[in-house]
Amino acid sequence: MTELRPPLPPFTRETASQKVRGAEDGWNSCDPEKVSLAYTPDSYWRNRSEFIKGRSEIVAFLTRKWVKELDYRLIKELWAFTGNRIAVRFAYEWHDDSGNWFRSYGNENWEFAQSGLMQRRLACINDLPITQADRKFNWDRSGPRPADHPSLSDLGL
């Protein structure tokens, strides 16, 4: 039986935006198992210089990531879409175990199977050291980014 993860391709502006917000909310949960279920069992990723294949490697990667990137908060924004592909830009804030804060900026290219599961994720990311006073993502970590929180564009990022 095929797993379905609506919305399904081909995407419209509305359904692509729903997919982006769903991915943001999933990643902000910092739950590797939950996040991995949005991807095909054989999903292929390039994240920075790391190559990842399949859900078990996704879970291992995200587990390592969120042990290092503490108080993680992410905002994604739709950049472009066509057919079964979506391009997003994103920024996330986090600190390391020494209390050093960062804002990481990036772009992702996503390709989806007809099931709505992501089959390919290609990400380029750069880290910028910031001070705690420079932080812009301050919502309560117990839930997703509030609907009325400014977008990346609204924040000038």
What does each of the following model-derived ranges do?
Residues 1-11, 60-157:
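A beta-strand edge to alpha-helix "cap/lid" segment located at domain peripheries
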Residues 1-41, 148-157:
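Short, low-complexity N-terminal intrinsically disordered segments enriched in polar/charged residues
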Residues 28-29, 40, 44, 63, ...:
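Short helix-capping and hinge/turn segments at secondary-structure transitions, especially at repeat
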Residues 44-63:
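Short solvent-exposed beta->alpha transition segments
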